[in-house]
Every structure is written in C-alpha cells, then in structure tokens.
Amino acid sequence: MSDKPSDAEILEGLGEIVEEVAGVSPDDVTADKSFVDDLDIDSLSMVEIAVQAEDRFGVKIPDDELANLKTVGDAVNYVSKNI
C-alpha cells in the first residue's frame, strides 16, 4: 500500500474539495483552521465535503465521526489513518 497519499497530499485534496463545495480558496485551507469558525462551512457543506473526500480518498466517514472533525487537521488525520 505504498500509494497512500502523504498528509500534504490529503491536505491539498481537501483544499480542492473545500474550494469546490464552499468557494474557499485552497490557500486558506490549512491544518489549523476550523471548518466552522475559520472557514464558515455549515453542516450541509460538511456532509458534501465528507462525501467528496470519501470518493477521492476511498475512505468511509460515518456521521458520528464527521461531527468530531472540527479542524482541517482533524480531517487530514482521519483520512490518513483510515485510508
């Protein structure tokens, strides 16, 4: 499984997804940013981001886990551990 993306690649991918879903510049999508407080992403957009991340990275993000992904870094770590 050497094709596993690096955390930087996951972050870049999430940045592209967030841009598509919420119109936020990928440059603003950094590991320390809160989806809600810093990037102004609502719960409906978070579900769409999760669906696209599942498709892109081949992971499953259950609703109860999605609620725990407060920051971009949380999402990167979750994807990295579950890929």
PLM regions: where:
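N-terminal helix-turn-helix DNA-binding core of bacterial DNA-binding proteins
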Residues: D28, D32-L39
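AMP-binding/adenylate-forming catalytic domain of the ANL superfamily
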Residues: D64-G73
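Short hydrophobic/aromatic patches at helix-to-coil boundaries
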Residues: N77-I83
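Short coil/turn motifs that cap or connect alpha-helices
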Residues: S25, K60-P62
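Two-component histidine kinase catalytic core, primarily the HATPase_c
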Residues: S45
